Swiss-Prot record:
It is found in: Nucleus. Disruption phenotype: Period lengthening of various circadian output rhythms and affected central clock gene expression. Derepressed expression of circadian-regulated and cold-responsive genes. Delayed flowering under long days conditions, and slightly in short days. Increased freezing tolerance. Its main location: nucleus. Residues 20-37 have a biased composition (Low complexity). Together with COR27, involved in central circadian clock regulation and in flowering promotion, by binding to the chromatin of clock-associated evening genes TOC1, PRR5, ELF4 and cold-responsive genes in order to repress their transcription. Negative regulator of freezing tolerance. GO terms for biological process: negative regulation of DNA-templated transcription; regulation of circadian rhythm; regulation of photoperiodism, flowering; response to abscisic acid; response to absence of light; response to blue light; response to cold; response to red light. GO terms for cellular component: nucleus. The gene is COR28. It comes from Arabidopsis thaliana. Induction: Regulated by the circadian clock at warm growth temperatures as direct targets of CCA1, with highest levels from noon to dusk. Repressed by CCA1 at the transcription level via chromatin binding and in a temperature-dependent way. Induced by cold. Induced by abscisic acid (ABA). Transcription is repressed by blue and red lights, but induced by darkness; by contrast, present at low levels in darkness but accumulates in blue light (at protein level) due to transcription auto-repression. This is Cold-regulated protein 28. Residues 1-51, 166-218 are annotated as: Disordered.
Amino acid sequence: MENDCTVNIVSLEKDRDVSEASAESQSESTLSNSLDSGVTAETSRSDADSKLDECTAWTNEKHNSYLDYLESSFVRQLYSLLGGGTQRLSRTRDVQSNSHKSADQFTVLQNGCWQKVNFGKKQSCLETSSEFRFHRNSLRNKPENSNGNYTMGTTVQGDVLCHDETKHSEASGQNFREEEEEEEKGEVSKKREREANNDDSSLKEDQVVPVRMVKPRT
């Protein structure tokens, strides 16, 4: 009986050692598997992050496309506010392309729509200035009217005048007014001298010169 009990105890201890060893091996395998899975998860996460960075990287091409998108959206909103549509936008682009070909035509925004405005060349400005000078010279030769003022019949042709020629015309007009004032002052002084001379002559005529009576000799 004692031998049987001893054998049973020894067998139980062996079974316990085997179970402990198997449990340790299982725990080690489980730990290694968890470590491997963690490494795999980290690797997959880093791969996903790198792919996301590649997709969201800001390049020059994306920057240019973004700017084009902003420009087109701004133009669409502008024309929607102005009451225009896509057809007007295409027409505007055609008008702008044609306006660059013409040297004297410019496209401006007036009353909510694009319009062509013709600006005259420098030759038209020269013609206008020469016409103004011609009328000014002819005005000097014209007599005064009943009120003592000169009659101005100058007409400026053309819708748009050059800025420089306008300044020149204003300066010429100012000089002309000064010349008119000087001429009027000269005429007034001449009239006064003429009146003074007339008064002197009338006084001379009205003077009574005493005449000595000479008695004849007998």
